[in-house]
């Protein structure tokens, strides 16, 4: 009898584990992704990397500005009342807009844009990548 119960429990455990292939809807985790601590942590990581890489103040200002602008531009489609910075900043052209019916988690897209721009700016890309992966896992 004990072996039957044990076998049944193993079967149920495997069955439920294999049955959880549900695709997440962006609206389910959008609220969690809008947590400002993710952006603050990303900027703090950028500061740590700049201190480690020893960058001059003019370069540091660009290291902050470009990723933040990238993050803002990725977030603008979710806020129609906000205006894109394209045409207002020297050399910034219009960013391609997503389809109207696209299911996108804009805060996550914003973080992805931030990390992509940040990695392009610094020497210690791996430090930025590790921080990004930690945020994506939460």
What are these regions (language model features)?
Residues 2-9:
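Sec-dependent signal peptide recognition
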Residues 14-17:
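C-terminal motif of bacterial Sec signal peptides marking the signal peptidase cleavage site
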Residues 19-138:
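Acidic/polar surface patches and capping/hinge elements
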